[in-house]
C-alpha cells in the first residue's frame, strides 16, 4: 500500500455527495449554486454543474471526429462548497444523526433531514 504524501492529512470522506445542491462559499464563483456532478473524496474535490467552467482543447478522435474547443466544469475544493438547506435555501453545515436506525445528514440551521 503506498504511503500518503506529506501534505495529505485528510480522510477519504466528504460532506457532500453526488446529486446534492451546493453553494460556492469563496473564490470567483462565490454565491453560485449547482448540483454536484462528481465527488472526488481522495482529492477532496467536487465538480459542480455550471460552476468553474474551463476551456478544453479536444483532439479529433473516432468518437469525436470534429474535435475543437469545449467548455467543461472544473473541480473545486470541497471546503469551498456548502450544502443548501432544503427549507431556507441558504448554505448550511451538516450534522450526522441516527434516525430509525440509519445514519442521516441533518441541516444544522433548520434541523431538516437532507437524505
Curated annotation (Swiss-Prot):
One of its GO terms (biological process) is translation. CDD domains: KOW_RPL26. SMART domains: KOW. InterPro entries: KOW (IPR005824), Rib_uL2_dom2 (IPR014722), Ribosomal_uL24 (IPR003256), Ribosomal_uL24_CS (IPR005825), Ribosomal_uL24_KOW (IPR041988), Translation_prot_SH3-like_sf (IPR008991). It comes from the Bacteria. GO terms for cellular component: ribonucleoprotein complex; ribosome. Keywords: Ribonucleoprotein, Ribosomal protein, RNA-binding, rRNA-binding. Signal peptide: none annotated. Gene3D superfamilies: 2.30.30.30. Pfam families: KOW, ribosomal_L24. GO terms for molecular function: rRNA binding; structural constituent of ribosome. One of two assembly initiator proteins, it binds directly to the 5'-end of the 23S rRNA, where it nucleates assembly of the 50S subunit. One of the proteins that surrounds the polypeptide exit tunnel on the outside of the subunit. Belongs to the universal ribosomal protein uL24 family. Part of the 50S ribosomal subunit. This is Large ribosomal subunit protein uL24. It comes from Deinococcus deserti (strain DSM 17065 / CIP 109153 / LMG 22923 / VCD115).
Amino acid at each position: 500500500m503506498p504511503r500518503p504524501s506529506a501534505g495529505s492529512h485528510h480522510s477519504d470522506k466528504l460532506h457532500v455527495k453526488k446529486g446534492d445542491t451546493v453553494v460556492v462559499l469563496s473564490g470567483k464563483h462565490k454565491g453560485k449554486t449547482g448540483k454536484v456532478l462528481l465527488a472526488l473524496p481522495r482529492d477532496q474535490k467536487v465538480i459542480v454543474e455550471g460552476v468553474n467552467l474551463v476551456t478544453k482543447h479536444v483532439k479529433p478522435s473516432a468518437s469525436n471526429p470534429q474535435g475543437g474547443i469545449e467548455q467543461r466544469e472544473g473541480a473545486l475544493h470541497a471546503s469551498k462548497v456548502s450544502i443548501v438547506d432544503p427549507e431556507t435555501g441558504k448554505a448550511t453545515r451538516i450534522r450526522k444523526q441516527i434516525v430509525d436506525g440509519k445514519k442521516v445528514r441533518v441541516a444544522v440551521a433548520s434541523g431538516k433531514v437532507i437524505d
